[in-house]
């Protein structure tokens, strides 16, 4: 499983669900999520899922246990720490070289935004240093022992997270398409996870991706394409064809945990009823409060849902008083997703800590 969370904190959850590490409960394993927007994964509902997954996993042989990995880009400094800790155990000389490379980030006090702003003002960045550490880790052969192979994989993806985070924050402050950088990083993580899982099990790897519709749908069927944006769902379809199955989630009304702006405290909002004529409104008009639709291969559904309609997207920020402008855009759901899940009324998650 790949979730829209950072690599390092999610890897702690992965160790817990696999019966590894020192955490004694799912809530403790989730306690690493301290930064905004921590409630997205540090909540009671995800905690309960993690506990159930651990119980299931412990009844399986190690190679069949389901992992939970982070695919997002907001992880430079914790990921660098993980790389250095791994190299120190397996190759102290490589660890020393990597530490020298990562000193490039040391003046920014573990604040990625400060690095991005500084890189914008200078012709110098830490791009080459981050790439050099990726090469250091890549030189270490992948162990045959499943547990050691898992640790090696974690180091590989941690090094990639440093490089991905460096590129993302440098791009954000340069005014370029940072969205594309982020979703391309997600795609590399998902493909890396699939390859790793396949190597462990001896079968083609399967990854369930858990993220917002804006990442998991196909951007070519949305207004985002007009802005030159791509996304994870699009990349998976382009690279893997029908092996990628994209599922969207829709709700008409309910409550949601969000913040009024990035970095501010979260609160529970009443989610406004969906706008007339939007996809969620059309789904509600069926009179069925919860259902799923398989769009792929269903020509009648594709015909009925093929015209562009408004589609709502609520992420970690919610602005109900300017909802039409900030949370709706045109989309063609029949091209965006292979399936859609609709629940008329949804409830907010329960934040922990």
Q: What annotation goes with each model-predicted range?
A:
Residues 1-353:
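Structured catalytic-domain cores with a bias toward divalent-metal coordination
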């Amino acid at each position: 499983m790949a979730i829209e969370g950072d690599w390092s904190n999610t890897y702690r959850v992965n160790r817990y669900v696999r019966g590894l590490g020192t955490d004694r409960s799912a809530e403790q394993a989730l306690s690493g999520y301290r930064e905004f927007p921590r409630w997205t994964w540090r909540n009671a509902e995800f905690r309960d899922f993690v506990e159930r997954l651990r119980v299931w996993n412990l009844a399986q042989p190690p190679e069949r246990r389901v992992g939970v990995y982070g695919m997002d880009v907001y992880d430079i400094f914790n990921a660098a720490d993980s790389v250095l800790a791994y190299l120190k155990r397996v190759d102290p000389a490589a660890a020393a070289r990597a530490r020298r490379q990562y000193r490039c980030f040391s003046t920014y006090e573990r604040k990625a935004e400060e690095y991005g702003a500084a890189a914008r003002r200078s012709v110098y960045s830490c791009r080459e240093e981050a790439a050099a550490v990726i090469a250091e880790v890549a030189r270490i052969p992948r162990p045959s022992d499943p547990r050691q192979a898992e640790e090696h994989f974690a180091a590989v993806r941690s090094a990639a997270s440093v490089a991905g985070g460096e590129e993302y924050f440098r791009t954000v402050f340069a005014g370029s398409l940072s969205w594309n950088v982020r979703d391309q990083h997600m795609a590399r993580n998902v493909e890396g996870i699939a390859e790793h899982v396949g190597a462990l099990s001896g079968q083609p790897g399967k990854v369930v991706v858990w993220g917002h519709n804006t990442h998991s749908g196909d951007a070519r069927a949305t207004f985002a394409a007009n802005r030159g944006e791509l996304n994870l769902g699009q990349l998976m379809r382009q690279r893997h064809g029908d092996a990628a199955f994209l599922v969207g989630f829709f709700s008409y009304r309910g409550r949601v945990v969000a913040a009024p702006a990035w970095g501010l405290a979260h609160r529970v909002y009443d989610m406004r009823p969906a706008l007339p004529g939007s996809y969620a409104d059309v789904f509600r008009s069926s009179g069925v409060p919860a259902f799923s639709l398989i769009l792929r291969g269903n020509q009648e559904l594709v015909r009925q849902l093929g015209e562009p309609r408004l589609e709502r997207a609520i992420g970690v920020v919610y602005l109900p008083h300017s909802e039409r402008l900030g949370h709706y855009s045109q989309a063609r759901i029949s091209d965006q997703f292979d399936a859609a899940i609709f629940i008329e009324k949804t409830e907010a998650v329960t934040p922990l800590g």
